[in-house]
Amino acid sequence: MERTLVLIKPDGVRRNIIGEVISRIERKGLKIVAMELRTLDEETAKAHYEEHVEKPFFSSLVEFITGGPLVAMVVEGNRAIEAFRSLAGATDPVLAAPGTIRGDYGLDVQANIVHGSDSTYSAEREIKLFFPDLA
């Protein structure tokens, strides 16, 4: 079974759609094996988004992701990374298909409700960062 990290970002928590996201994950046949509501500290946020450190939007991304509580989950299932990314939709909600989480609820590329690991390597690194006991 493959595992992936899923975050319901602060915009999703603020808009009270945690249950909707979880329902979609479960209906897809994926299993939530760990879940926590937390406010991310700046150090963890910077480590999580380290691949963007040189990009002009890095500071605003860190500020956004630390700006309120989020839900962190480890999701498991057959091809979990690909399965969740198909549920999430394109990063830009304008380009995300209707019926995807971002297509239905996302506002812009930052306030796009969820994050999901994009590769096996990223999933392992991100799970270790958020849930070290599961790594």
Swiss-Prot record:
Cell location: Cytoplasm
Residues engaged in binding ATP: K9, F57, R85, T91, R102, N112
GO biological process: CTP biosynthetic process; GTP biosynthetic process; UTP biosynthetic process
Catalytic activity: a 2'-deoxyribonucleoside 5'-diphosphate + ATP = a 2'-deoxyribonucleoside 5'-triphosphate + ADP; a ribonucleoside 5'-diphosphate + ATP = a ribonucleoside 5'-triphosphate + ADP
This protein's UniProt keywords: ATP-binding, Cytoplasm, Kinase, Magnesium, Metal-binding, Nucleotide metabolism, Nucleotide-binding, Phosphoprotein, Transferase
InterPro entries for this protein: NDK-like_dom (IPR034907), NDK-like_dom_sf (IPR036850), Nucleoside_diP_kinase (IPR001564)
Active site: H115 (pros-phosphohistidine intermediate)
CC cofactor: Mg(2+)
Keyword Magnesium: yes
GO annotation, cellular component aspect: cytoplasm
Chief location category: cytoplasm
SMART domains: NDK
Gene Ontology terms, MF aspect: ATP binding; metal ion binding; nucleoside diphosphate kinase activity
EC category name: transferase
Domain of life: Bacteria
Annotated EC: 2.7.4.6
Task of the protein: Major role in the synthesis of nucleoside triphosphates other than ATP. The ATP gamma phosphate is transferred to the NDP beta phosphate via a ping-pong mechanism, using a phosphorylated active-site intermediate.
Family: Belongs to the NDK family.
Oligomeric and partner information: Homotetramer.
Protein name as it appears in the record: Nucleoside diphosphate kinase
Natural source organism: Thermobifida fusca (strain YX)
